[in-house]
Amino acid sequence: AHGAGGEVGHACVEPEEEAVCNCGNHGCLEQMTSATGIVRLAKKYLASHDTPSSLRERGESISAKAVFDALKEGDAAAEAIVQEFSEYLGRALAVFACVVDPEVIVVGGGVSKAGKPLTDCIQKYYQKYAFPSCKSTPIILASLGNDAGIYGAARMVIKD
């Protein structure tokens, strides 16, 4: 009816977010859990906490990769940032699972390069918020990585 079916990335997960999403709203899932969202969360965290972090040395050039690299090195600030990111995503996935009841949840895109530590963290929050019968749904990484959308689009063209 409105062309918005499947736009789950624009479900509001943080109504207090001040930054505006590209859709015009605030606190959308995509805004909070994309690579740029992780950068925004990192900058916000570092500005409001005194936690020592290797990320501080990067100044404005923080990237999602830098956050995940710092996490692997045991950086406490990176851990807090990834926990916040994972809570947003895990909670949203728990809501979506109530609607679509998936056999498996596949995480893709640039952030999926963080690997198993990321899916473990997302799974923790997913299980915290999921409807009891959905709690065992596994969360895995997309095997096609960031190219999954390209393969899917090509498949649709070939199929039609």
What positions do the PLM features span?
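Short, intrinsically disordered, charge-biased short linear motifs at domain edges
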Residues: 5-14
